[in-house]
Amino acid sequence: MSIRYQTDVLIVGAGLAGLVTALELLDSEHRILILDRDEPARLGGLAKESFGGVTMIGTPHQKRTGIRDSPELALADWIRTAEFEAGDAWPRRWADYYLNHSLQDVYHWLSQRSVKFFPVVHWVERG
């Protein structure tokens, strides 16, 4: 028995990027189909392993609690923990871009979708 689906867009992978893409397309009233290799209980991919933590710079939560951060400070931390090699130009560019755009592209995007934040400082290094 074969199953047929009709969709405007097929998204392969239900990790963070796939789910964000799906939300954006649903906002535009597209019909979507998401295919993922995992079972439904593991929906979210590697994002689930981050304990829900997201790196963002300059959020109202940080300012309210007196946490001083900047893209420059965060980039120095990122470079130190990532252990980039000499030829890692694109990963460095990505880190710089992300840190300079995390407030608008991540924090405000999530806030517009009524995502609530539990303001706890986490370190990726778990240190």
Residue ranges and their predicted role:
Residues 37-127:
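Conserved N-terminal/central alpha/beta ligand/cofactor-binding core
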Residues 7-34:
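N-terminal Rossmann-like FAD-binding beta1-loop-alpha1 element of flavoenzymes
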